Amino acid sequence: MLTRSPASAAATSPTTTVTVTVTAAATSPRPSRGAAPHGHFHYAPTPSLREAASRIPALSSRRQSATAPATSSTSLPISIQSRHGPAPVASHTSSPVASDPGLGFPPSSRPQRWAGVDVVAQYSPMEPMDYTTGALLSSQAASSSNNQAVARGSIESRPSHIPNTVGPMASHEEQASALASTSEATAAPIPHGPTVAVAVPPTPGVYSAAPQPHPLSHTPQTGTPVKRRNSQGDVTHNQVEAASAGQSGPHSPKRARLAPKIVSRRYEHCPVEDLVVLIAHMLGELIELNDEAAQKVGQRHNLTRFHSRTTPGISVLDYLHRLAKHAYLSPPILLSMVYYIDRLCALYSDFTINTLTVHRFLITAATVAAKGLSDSFLTNTLYARVGGVRVAELNMLELEFLHRVDWKIVPDPDVLVAYYGGLVARCPGYILECPEPEEADDEDEDEELDESDAIGDDDDDIDGEGGEREEETSSSQRDRHAT
């Protein structure tokens, strides 16, 4: 509620034009502040809009500074609330600094300020008031305080220019414009005198164009600056030399091949593991050749008892290692299995070694060779368990194999020697040991013959001397008888 005497309204300047927007309170009467102590109340009528309009220009004239022009047009929206109304309402007031044309603010771009109104205090936001104590000031005190404020200089509650800040997702053009506006706003004339370094905080929301080092990539520097500089130069020079040498130098040589393993010329002395590798290498080449030939021709394989429905998951090398380890296969048995391949293919035209027949052939050939060449062998139950087939199926495979090879399962020893030499020659990682020199054997034989001849001559000499002695003894005996 505005409580001003009519006398103050008469002091209004006739040259000032003020536009006032007043929100009147409820028209219902309300008790005055000076109520009687015994419950007698008198009601003060609400001031009319005409009286309020006559009071506002007087108040606004007192608030204007000495530097303001004589005539101005000011819009003062004021919200008048009742004493027992809701929470304080923010009213829109004009700042004397913002309305000062000397600061360069156009009328349309004046910054907006808000002033809170305490409902309990019942004062007008346009009345002069000491905000430190909360007491109202008289007209003389208000004018003196205004003069002191003008003498000290106006204090702005916000900066004269707010730079346009951009968010983290702004484009490069917006960031560049924000940096330019910030530099223009913070530019100031350089004073004549000693230079003072001032730290200017960065504008929030604007990214700096200079690259910032990563905190994790920063390494502590030790030593004097000169040593640090020299060490950095040395490291950079070394890095450049290493890079140029790597680009211009020859390519690094490939890994050297391992030397071939030397095996004995007699297959009986060859280790089982090496013989398994030799046989697996030969079977791999044979399977690859037969599979490619079948795909080119496009003919369908004639099914045999050795065919599987699908390719087993174990490789030929691993399968051979399993058989040799758990079925106790010796080198002659392994070489006999290779011999059976040629014999079965020669006598059974529908059979070929491929990915579907190799596993069943190997377990069948191992069973037959162990029974035909070894003095001790396992039962078909154990062979079937090692080979991964049923006992009944292994029995059928064994009978089929014996019938196809015409029951001839014992190869000639010279044939096994020939197969062994062929396996070593086909595998690149193995070679046979050098043969023993024959000249040494011939010399030994000649020496033995010479020794035997010398022994024979000695025997002849002994025999001749004995004969002469016998003749002498016989002649002497004759002479005695004659006498």
Curated annotation (Swiss-Prot):
Q: Where is the composition biased (Acidic residues)?
A: 435-473
Q: Which family does it belong to?
A: Belongs to the cyclin family.
SUPFAM superfamilies, sorted? Cyclin-like
Q: Name any GO cellular component annotation.
A: nucleus
Low complexity bias spans: 1-32, 60-80, 176-200
What CDD domains does the record point to?
CYCLIN_ScPCL7-like (cd20558)
Where are the stretches annotated Disordered? 1-112, 164-234, 434-483
GO molecular function of the protein, one example?
cyclin-dependent protein serine/threonine kinase regulator activity
What organism is the protein native to? Neurospora crassa (strain ATCC 24698 / 74-OR23-1A / CBS 708.71 / DSM 1257 / FGSC 987)
Q: What is this protein called in UniProt?
A: Nuc-1 negative regulatory protein preg
- Outcome (variant: residue 398 to Q): In ML178; loss of function
Cited function: Negative regulator, together with pgov, of the transcriptional activator nuc-1, which controls the expression of phosphorous acquisition enzymes.
Pfam families membership? Cyclin
- Bilayer-crossing regions: none
Source domain of life:
Eukaryota
Record's keyword terms, sorted: Cyclin, Repressor, Transcription, Transcription regulation
Q: Is Repressor included in the keywords of this UniProt record?
A: yes
Show the InterPro entries listed in the entry: Cyclin-like_sf, Cyclin_PHO80-like
